[in-house]
Regions:
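Detector for C-terminal structural segments
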Residues: 34, 38-49, 273, 277, ...
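Structural transition elements
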Residues: 267, 360, 391-424, 439-447
Length: 589
């Protein structure tokens, strides 16, 4: 049985946030009363689901000091008053001249897009989903995915062609300028690729472009991109590679770019209030005729804690939130103020095991212990209770990835077999391990982790949580190899719908993200990213999946079904590639 707060406890937790908003002057008394009445109406619908567990509230903004905790839920800290929400509704005694609507005003769209801040405003110097989303608004890519066909279509590029097995010709749109007036040309494209593939730049995205050997400028609006070997997912990589102005970058340097993003996108950067929000203003000179955002201002807010986020959504001080736990969907949908949007996405969640002793020697170096951990966990039970619609990923790949093999069988829930495997590995009395956790976009992450902890301990794998509330601290530790012997993780494949988008980064021994080393798998992954024959690639990834399943370098979990909360005053839909495009949002008339 999965334990969690009662509907009353959850109601009180959300209402406490509204009281705080009122005390801070962020909402007036009328809004407080209205929000409380709305939530009371939805709380009854929540009751039947609340027993599924506590909300995912282990994230925090970067203004918090990193905190390590032992046990279940992570600490949270309320954000400071950022002072940039729409004005409060007036009370009857207030002057109506200060009136502002609840929800979008027509001028401003307010999105709570993260619980943790970004490390930088440089689109090349991060590996965070929230960074991708933010920079999709200020910058453009050579290609963009069509959500209807799932194909990459030209954007800054006018066309591309594989003119030789290892050469791609890209023709660029003419007449596009950056927000500072610099022109976008072939020199821009070459400079951006040269920068991100330069090892001295130390971009966390270098692996996305490891196949690039060189870029030649043919004329002002044509480049030839040469790959080391034939590169079948070259076009997929074009949809997540934001262009920055080379002249500005050369003149001002990396430190300037880290604070002042300049792109060609539909919104311009205004201000980064660290730990609080990113303020953007519509680019009224945007080059694409079909993109004309109705909101003049877009505010991307950092708000720790799902209860706080939901309180803001239902109080009308936020228009979109990126995470709504499944057990709170009914309350939002019945609120009359907002509704939920559900989308199966490419992101995969898993619990990584340090199979290569990257952090330190540990029991998970033994494959029998790794299989024991997988058999100890009732993955399908967690899906049924906490992740409705989640897709099993028996060898890490999501069914949405090209190369997915549906014949791979997942580990069965078998506690007795788990105990036998531990004993065979020399641990008849079990093991004691630390599980490192950081902020996560997985719905109900806390409940999932706690349920897994109980199941693991039932077979003798005794787990102590180390919860890092600051996402930047967790990412740094993870990438430096200090997140063993086990840690929670999820990966969105940089929105590449191909096995290479997750396997190479998560499992190839050269990756900064990996905690596993297998030369046979490395060779297959290299072959998979070099063959242009789809059938050959399918066979390569079938073999790779069998190795991954047999080696079990992580506890395999599921592909996400994500839930967003959207104000009833806003017409907007999420995407399967998990790149939220808020410039497509429209006010409901």
């Amino acid at each position: 049985m999965l334990n969690g707060p009662s509907a009353r406890e959850l109601h009180e937790r959300v209402y406490a946030n509204w009281e705080r908003f009122y005390q801070e002057g962020r909402i007036d008394r009328r809004t407080l009363i209205k929000a409380a009445m709305v939530w009371a109406g939805g709380a009854g619908a929540l009751g039947a689901l609340a027993a599924c567990g506590d909300e995912d509230d282990d994230d925090s903004g970067s203004s918090m000091a990193p905190t390590a905790t032992t046990g279940g839920a992570a600490p949270t800290t309320a954000p400071e008053d950022d002072g940039d929400d729409a004005d409060d509704e007036p009370t009857e005694a207030e002057d109506d001249s200060d009136d502002a609507e609840s929800g979008p005003t027509g001028d401003t769209l307010r999105v709570i897009f993260s619980e943790s801040d970004l490390p930088t405003m440089d689109p090349h110097m991060h590996n965070l989903r929230t960074g991708i989303i933010a920079f999709y608004h200020t910058h453009d890519n050579l290609g963009v995915r069509n959500p209807d066909t799932n194909l990459i279509e030209p954007w800054l590029a006018e066309s591309w062609e594989n003119i030789e097995p290892t050469t791609w010709e890209i023709k660029l749109r003419e007449g596009i300028t950056f927000h500072n007036g610099d022109p976008f040309t072939a020199e821009t494209v070459k400079w951006n690729w040269d920068r991100i593939t330069n090892p001295e730049q130390a971009s966390q995205q270098i692996g996305n472009h490891a196949a690039i050997e060189s870029v030649d400028v043919i004329d002002e609006y044509t480049v030839h991109v040469h790959t080391i070997e034939p590169y079948p997912i070259f076009v997929e990589r074009l949809q997540n590679f934001q262009m920055i102005p080379e002249k500005l970058a050369q003149e001002e340097g990396d430190s300037y770019l880290a604070e002042n993003p300049v792109g060609t996108g539909p919104y311009k950067f205004v201000e980064w209030r660290k730990g609080q929000e990113i303020i953007l203003e519509r680019n009224d000179d945007y080059w694409h005729p079909d993109i004309n955002p109705p909101y003049k201002n877009l505010i991307l807010r950092i708000v720790p804690g799902v209860p706080t986020q939901l309180a803001e959504l239902l109080a009308g001080t936020a228009d979109i939130v990126r995470v709504v736990p499944f057990d709170q969907m009914a309350a939002v949908d019945n609120s009359g103020v907002a509704s939920t949007k559900t989308q199966a996405i490419l992101r995969v969640g898993f619990t990584r095991l340090d199979a290569m002793a990257r952090t330190a020697p540990n029991p998970f170096e033994d494959v029998r212990v790794r299989h024991a951990a997988n058999h100890a966990c009732d993955i399908q039970g967690y899906i049924d209770a906490l992740q409705p619609g989640g897709d099993r990923t028996p060898a890490l790949l999501n069914p949405k990835h090209f190369g997915f093999d549906p014949s791979i069988e997942p580990h069965e829930y078998d506690p007795d077999l788990a105990r036998e495997l531990l004993a065979e590995a020399g641990y008849p009395d079990g093991i004691d391990v630390t599980w490192v956790r950081g902020p996560s976009s997985m719905p109900n992450q806390d409940q999932v982790d706690q349920a897994m902890q109980r199941d693991l301990e039932a077979v003798g794998i005794r787990v102590t949580f180390e919860t890092l509330s600051d996402g930047l601290v967790f990412t740094t530790r993870h990438n430096e190899g200090q997140a063993g012997p086990m840690h929670s993780y999820n990966w969105g494949s940089y929105s590449v719908f191909d096995a290479d988008g997750i396997y190479y980064d998560m499992l190839h021994s050269s990756s900064i993200f990996t905690y596993y080393n297998n030369p046979e798998l490395d060779e297959l992954l290299e072959d998979g990213r070099e063959s242009l024959d789809p059938d050959e690639r399918m066979e390569i990834y079938r073999k790779a999946q069998r190795i991954v399943r047999d080696e079990a370098p992580m506890i395999f979990m599921w592909g996400f079904h994500a839930v967003w909360g959207v104000s009833n005053n806003v017409d907007w839909s999420p995407r399967a590639d998990e790149i939220d495009m808020y410039f497509t949002a429209r006010p409901v008339s």
